[in-house]
Amino acid sequence: VVADTLRFFIHWKQKQDRTDYDLSAFFMNKDYTNAGHVSWTRLSDDVGGATVVHSGDITSAPNGASEFIDIKLNGLTHSYIVAQVNRYVGDDFSQAEESFFGFMERNEKQKGLPFEPKTVKVKSEVRGKGQVAVPAVFFRNKNGWFCKWLDMQLTGQPICNTVEGNKATTSMMIKSIMERKNLTIKDLMDLLPGTQDETKMAYVGFQQPETLSKGITKVMTLDNLTGLIPQ
């Protein structure tokens, strides 16, 4: 993320019933403990040294509706920002005529419409059977702020879901994701039977090249990549 302000947005349009989706930002410390939030129940706050402002609560969307949260990243001391969309009442995410979340990178000098296209970095549909969508988590390290796209959902409650009601579940989920070590191609190759020989090399790619470097004894492409997975 390279901007002064991170802006979350949710847009939805109801199909059957009066539908209220609530955009929230949940902040966590380095140890994944609760560090505050901004949502329709708390429209603005100084969180971890940064100003965070919600655009306001909209409770129905017959013609479409949007909510925004602006987060000033300069000075923010917390380690994680979790984006949430809570279904309060109405159509499920799978039933709504339209439902999507995204984020923008905004600078102080920028002015224009809320959906100014050039500032939108990512936008994706919110669909699924859960009642609480967790589209993304933003995390900070020594090089700045970064986004990990999740596209996950919590089961939640039948109605009246709020960020206050699911902080514990959300923090546990984010911790498990951020601390998980994903398998690499090397990990899978190490699981194959046989004695490892450090002098052997393998080529892994979408397709086999016309020429191979000296020393490559195995070629893995999309045609046989599944062979790396042990039976």
What residues fall within each predicted segment?
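Intrinsic-disorder/low-complexity signal
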Residues: 1-231
